UniProtKB/Swiss-Prot annotation:
Topology relative to the membrane: Multi-pass membrane protein
Organism, as annotated: Vaccinia virus (strain Western Reserve) (VACV)
Transmembrane segments: 39-59, 67-87
Taxonomic lineage of the native organism: Viruses, Varidnaviria, Bamfordvirae, Nucleocytoviricota, Pokkesviricetes
Family recorded in the similarity comment: Belongs to the orthopoxvirus OPG096 family.
Protein name from the UniProt record: Protein OPG096
Pfam families: Chordopox_L2 (PF05803)
Length: 87
């Protein structure tokens, strides 16, 4: 149990360090642009980070659960065929 808590503590510390680095990079990018464009740069970076997180989550979800997702797709197709052709 101690190994797991130590690993979780290491992950938390690494996440904090990564967040500080990303904030440093974003701050540097913001100050290279005119003041009018800074909110747009922040918005673009936030959207980009959001898309990256969604992509990573989707790849992980599909790679770990592809059998269940295929069964779900087959079920939806079957129910759609039943709905349109039988009823």
């Amino acid at each position: 149990m101690e190994v797991i808590t130590d690993r979780l503590d290491d992950i938390v510390k690494q996440n904090i360090a990564d967040e500080k680095f990303v904030d440093f990079v974003i701050h540097g990018l913001e100050h290279q642009c005119p003041a009018i464009l800074r909110p747009l740069i922040r918005l673009f970076i936030d959207i980009l980070l959001f898309v990256i997180v969604i992509y990573i989550f989707t790849v992980r979800l599909v790679s770990r659960n592809y059998q269940m997702l295929l069964a779900l797709v087959a079920l939806v197709i079957t129910l759609t065929i039943f709905y349109y052709f039988i009823l």
